[in-house]
Amino acid sequence: MTKPRIVAIDDEVEFIDVLENYFGLRGYGINVAVRGAKGIEIVKEKMPDVVLMDLKMPGIDGDEVLKLFKSMTPSPKVIFITAYDDGGKTKARLLKMGAYACLDKPVSSLKELEETVNKAASN
């Protein structure tokens, strides 16, 4: 089975390093960005299967980026990973808008994240 292609966008460099190492060592094609605008460029260029993205980053609106990614053909599956908590309202809205999943940060299990990525890519 071919591993999904991933783009990870997060302004926390340490978290990006963890994702890049974890998925890279397991044979996934992964590109990373610590700035939202650069991440959008990479997604447009690489056309990944899955985008892992923080919701709250300087100069970037998760809702708008999700709309942009959903308008692409083929459209990548977007998995938000965020520490932002407003009682689940934002997560519910993003899921309704077409996000594949909204996960809590810190990520409790990279293995579970990997399973979510694989499920997203196979849908």
Where are these regions (language model features)?
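Active-site T/S-Asp motif of two-component receiver
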Residues: A8, M53-D54
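Two-component/phosphorelay signaling modules centered on CheY-like receiver
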Residues: V13-N31
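Helix N-cap/capping motif at the beta->alpha junctions
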Residues: V32-E41, G62
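Short amphipathic alpha-helix used as the core "switch/output" element in two-component signaling
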Residues: E41, D63-P74
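Active-site beta3 strand of CheY-like receiver
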Residues: K46-L52
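Receiver (REC) domain active-site loop signature in two-component systems and cognate sites
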Residues: M57
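Alpha4 helix (beta4-alpha4-beta5 surface) of REC/receiver domains from two-component response regulators
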Residues: E64, D85-V107, K111-E115
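Hydrophobic/aromatic residues positioned on beta-strands within the core alpha/beta folds
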Residues: I81-T82
